Amino acid sequence: MASTLPPQTWEAGYARPADQASWEAETNYVAESGERAHWMLPVHTEPPTSTIGNGLGLTHLRTWPSIYDGTATGKPEWFKPSKEVDVLICGAGPFGLELGLILARQGISFRIVDKANAPCLSGRADGVHPRALEQLHAWGLAHEVSEEGPILNSTVLFRNGVKLFHGFSSTCDSRYKGIHIITQGQMERIYIRDLLRHQIVVERGTTVQHFNVQSTSQDHPVRATLKNVATGEEEVVRARYLIGADGAASSIREQLGVEFDGITTDIYWAIMDCRFKTDYPHILGFNIIISAEHGGSIVIPREDGYTRFYTQINGEKARKLQANRQARRNASTVGETRIDDHGITPDEVLEQLNKIIAPHKVEFASPMSWFSVWRVSERVARHFSSPDLRVHLGGDAAVLGAFGLNSSIYDAANLGWKLGLVLRKHAEPSILTTYDKERRLFANRVIRCSGAYLRFICNSSLPLAALRDLGEHLESHDENLPLLDGSTEADREFLYTFFKRHAMFLLGVEWPIVNSAICPADTKVRASSLRNGVRAPNPRVCLATDYTAYLYDKMMGVGRFHLLLFGSDLQGPVRQRLAVLAGELRKREGFYERFGGREMFNLILVVKTLSHQTAELLEGDLAPLKDHATTVYDDRAPDDDAHYWYGVNHARGALVVVRPDLAVGVSVWPEEIGKLNKYFASFLLECEETLPTKKSLLARLWDAL
């Protein structure tokens, strides 16, 4: 929400205005006997949501410090942080909080510290991709996030008064379809409440003063000194891993000595969240309005009648901002990105906006919810992980320029399960090398893709940032930059080629593929049409006679592999292939039991039978599937069922291994047990209880003789 909501009542069964909110009434906490309720109303405050207002003032947003501000309001009685933890997270922005959510769900011990005394209250990030919501769904949080604000349904693009595009916004086959609007502050509050349920409190006003990694043979090789900003008190904490989630000017990244490749531009954007009065006809959709003379503007509809305007600052105003920036001393190697002493007022930005949007007019219709000025920086850390794999970077500490909130979700989803498996002694530490490889190539594409589009909106001929590949060489690419020759034909051609190439990437459902142990190279003949490493599709299925949903609804959690076994109608030639896999499930030395059983594998049987037919068909040679698998019913028409989405041969079936981050690992025929063993043995550790003892090993040798 952009401001404190007025009092409401639900006495009629729906929300409507009230004179007073019942939670505020003293009588709501006293019994008829006069005895007071045991539960006490927490202290709340209503701070302003912006440091700078407009002529109508500032909005305020009610917040609850004892819920959201962590140790800044005191430590709960039950909170007793350990001096030895599995993971120490430096930074409680989106990435740090998201990684914490994943670790908490795996029972991993961690502490999370942040130098700020409170989370983000308003503004900053403005939307989440469908793919990001799919990750949040696996964590159990997507419904809350997706229902906060509107979804972007329409897109309008004007350049120099010419309408280049007016139509539906890009969508994909995800259940979440398109971009959902929500601010960073709303997201952080959702995350913090979740961590409280897991007995985790953000330690506020605290920094990692310095750290070192001692002998990696030690159980907790990371030694970090925490410092309380207010008192100066220091504490030494030991951890197995350290996470740099401390933003663009990351002290963890700088202590590691990791280069932050890229450029800091002289392109400035002012951002205003407010209610506006305007005669511009497309205010309720996503808009890009470009003036070759005055710059660009981006319009994003928000919740409760608010709108966000991004307005490019150019000309004399930009030179003034540049002078202010240069007058400040800044020790960060990145330079300033957010400009706090703006040197420009909301009224001046509104004046600039009206020049861009002319002949239409825009006026403030409410106090300011959020105002900020940002300088565009396009950077990617040269390495996301330290050579010893004990320190990892994510979020803005790793990539800066675009996709910030969404990239943080993808970073956390990628790193979280790998860290969890290593710490739970299910995987080799070498699996952590794949985090840097997979996420860094994604980050490079983010910077190239968003950079090209930014130059189109801002009418800039600035070259794209030069970034490293997975080695030490500059990455080669074929990203097209706009011609900017003033012709409508060139503009339309750029937009056509840009969105043809990047539409699905901009929704998060497509990304660069990096081959590794967890994502082996594709073979010419595959059991599924899906390529290794891509997003696992999420078709509709039937879960029970009276319940339909999506396949992902049976793929919840963060620390297990999902084994999707496609069995057609369980009859004919596919049955004997399924029987081979079913027999493997019973073997103690088989891959399923050897690498963790139910703790590591979520086996889902996808069948083309109806529920009343299935029980009998799962007798006999397929009986182990009934004991080990969750059955879902693929009863949609052949042109829209899960077998079609996954490209499965009904006579042969398929087993698709889906990683905990919902990407395809590998697909095999159901009878290819050797390939499954080889795949999992390349990075997983055998469970101790399944390892043969010396006695049993000798017994086997004796039997062999």
Swiss-Prot record:
Pathway: Secondary metabolite biosynthesis. InterPro entries: FAD-bd, FAD/NAD-bd_sf, Phe_hydrox_C_dim_dom, PHOX_C_sf, RIFMO-like, Thioredoxin-like_sf. Induction: Expression is induced by the azasperpyranone cluster A-specific transcription factor ATEG_03638 which is itself regulated by the azasperpyranone transcriptional regulator ATEG_07667. Pfam families: FAD_binding_3 (PF01494), Phe_hydrox_dim (PF07976). FAD binds at residues 86-115, 208, 308-310, 408. Its cofactor is FAD. Disruption phenotype: Abolishes the production of azasperpyranone A. GO terms for molecular function: FAD binding; oxidoreductase activity, acting on paired donors, with incorporation or reduction of molecular oxygen, NAD(P)H as one donor, and incorporation of one atom of oxygen. The keyword Flavoprotein applies. Azasperpyranones display potential anti-cancer activities. Azasperpyranones A, C, D, and F exhibit potent growth-inhibitory activity against the A549, HepG2, HCT-116, and HL-60 cell lines, with IC(50) values of 2.39-14.42 mm, respectively. Moreover, azasperpyranone D significantly inhibits HCT-116 xenograft tumor growth in BALB/c-nu mice. In addition, azasperpyranones A and C can bind with four kinds of therapeutic targets for cancer, eEF2K, FGFR, survivin, and TNF-a. Its EC number is 1.-.-.-. Keywords: FAD, Flavoprotein, Monooxygenase, Oxidoreductase. FAD-dependent monooxygenase; part of the cluster A that mediates the biosynthesis of azasperpyranones, members of the azaphilone family that exhibit anti-cancer activities. Azasperpyranones are synthesized by 2 clusters, A and B. Cluster A is responsible for the production of the polyhydric phenol moiety while the azaphilonoid scaffold is produced by the cluster B. The non-reducing polyketide synthase ATEG_03629 produces 5-methyl orsellinic acid, which is then reduced to 5-methyl orsellinic aldehyde by the NRPS-like protein ATEG_03630. Belongs to the PheA/TfdB FAD monooxygenase family. This is FAD-dependent monooxygenase ATEG_03635. It comes from Aspergillus terreus (strain NIH 2624 / FGSC A1156).
